[in-house]
Amino acid sequence: MKLTIAGDSHGKYMVAILEGLPSGIRVDEELIRRDLFRRRNCYGRGKRMKMEEDAFEIVSGLWKGITTGAPVTILIPNRAGNPVKDVRSVPRPGHIDYAAWVKYKLPDLNIYVERSSARWTVALTAAGSLLKSLLKEFGIEVLGFVTRLGNVEARDIPGDFEELKRRRDESVVFCPDPEATKEMVAEIDRAKEEGNTLGGKVKVIARGVPAGIGSYSDLFKKLDSKIGSLFFAIPAVKGVVIGSEEMWYGFDYLDEFELEDGKIKRKTNNLGGIEGGITNGEDVWVNVSVKPIPTTGKPLKSVDLRTMEPAKTPYVRSDVTAVPPASVVCEAALAVVISDALLEHLGDGNIDDLKRRFENENLPRWNDGFWKEHYR
């Protein structure tokens, strides 16, 4: 499977193209609408998100709502115009401005923002949301939520998946801890008043991923390699940890095996469902660190590249925090990575053929099948 994303932040469209999908997947367009709404409407967003509608259109690859096997193209119009009309020559610390100017040498810092802006994640969100219809065929669900925002950390995170999802959806910052949600809202209000921005952490879970997806032999097909590659492409993502972030002692960290009704299970899931680049049958857990947005309301020290004199950074329309929407984007990103690895494992064709391959795939027996079998 191949995902291509194109479009400028203030151009006519953002575009996502998915190639290599099987035919026969019934696409849930209402789910795509809901995910795009969640990305757009969360606490801490700026003025632009009030202008955008994200009214997507799927212009190829579907027939009567199901995939045909041809490339699926999603168009999302941009409604907001570019608020900066003048040439900008003062780079913002933490943004692409200076580094891109050094490499590409075009004399207007506005140019580089068009690609590096997080606006392109609307296309990633749409693509990942569409792929949830594929994952659903195999009983796989993906869920992202906020675990930290500024100095506020979630303390009461339910272990039950459905309860976690319900609480997440009730929170304006997508945090499943109601008390932490209130504190996060206050933290955002305080940062906005100060002209500051906030970073934080999000967690994404993929439930129902079978054992044996990924690779250990091809370093770049290892599932954790793919997760890191796509997640680090998301603007503001500065850290990706699969599984527990507490990994100091082996006795505490390593997930011991146990048998339960002929099935191999784990007592814990500190490894986050991946060992050596391959899924082990437990839920896949990804922890993501998101930096503060580099456009602050209070000017920072910089240099005017045109005059080479000290200068203050300009204010460009922006959010107070990218953390809540990042939980939606990272959820979509994990859906993309799992879908890609799953299709690599099961092959091409019609979705019913892939499901039969999946259902008929037995786990191996030791020593060419002469010993006891075990089950997924």
UniProtKB/Swiss-Prot annotation:
Catalytic activity, reaction form: 5-O-(1-carboxyvinyl)-3-phosphoshikimate = chorismate + phosphate
Cofactor: FMNH2
GO CC aspect terms: cytosol
Binding site for FMN: 115-117, 276, 291-295, 317
Annotated binding of NADP(+), by residue: 39, 45
Listed Pfam families: Chorismate_synt
HAMAP family: Chorismate_synth
Assembly information from the UniProt record: Homotetramer.
Protein known as: Chorismate synthase
Lineage per the UniProt record: Bacteria, Thermotogati, Thermotogota, Thermotogae, Thermotogales
